[in-house]
Amino acid sequence: MSNDSWSQMGEMGSSLLQGELQGLWLIPLLALPNAIYIWLWIMPGAWINTTKRATPIFGGSWPSDKTSQGDKACQYLAVLAHTIKMIQAACVVAWFRLYSPDSLTVSGVLAQPAWRIVLGVAGLAFGQCLNVAIYAAIGRNGVYYGSRLGAPLGPWVTGFPFNIPVVGRHPQYTGALLSLWGGVLLTSDDSATAAGFPTIAVLWTIIYIITGIVENTEGHGIVSDHPLRPDGPAAKKAARREKAA
């Protein structure tokens, strides 16, 4: 291979890398809610104190009992999470407008191969189905770490979507990732790929996986801490007390 060919390949690689690096500003914004979730998971008391200080600012009164405090903390977290999600969505749209404006158009999506359109739509549909299902199954407090914050919880749920193998451990995160990769299939044309959108999707996936691993720590997970779990820490503690009595 001639020196000119090597030079051209080097320039192409440098151009691609530069494009990807330029687009990676999106990652910190995408990682923000997961960073908050991990912090909250490890230090739930810190979030309780944060919401306690914030409540008077918004004209509310801080409840005196622990259960109501946990419920208030879940309420604040839900508002924060939805606000961040709207900001994230706006930033993703802005990213495409900057680097690949045609990717989000109907004509751009329909220009994708048929197999990508089918798989992309299926991923988005099933992903959103899981997201809706987990809210319906365990409610706001179940989704937003009520087990860690001491909020009132509904019954222990073993049905859909928790009964799906593998997926059932973290239906919401699985739904988010299915939606993400469905979107990648529908929008990653040449310009979006050159700007690094698949790379961003991989990094975003890793962030979700790390969050899921943290939440799977026995004794600290949303599933493990549920007071009504038949084989959970609360049930085992009650059994030990009964045995000692």
Predicted regions span which residues?
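Membrane-anchoring alpha-helices and their flanking helix-loop junctions
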Residues: 1-167, 174-245
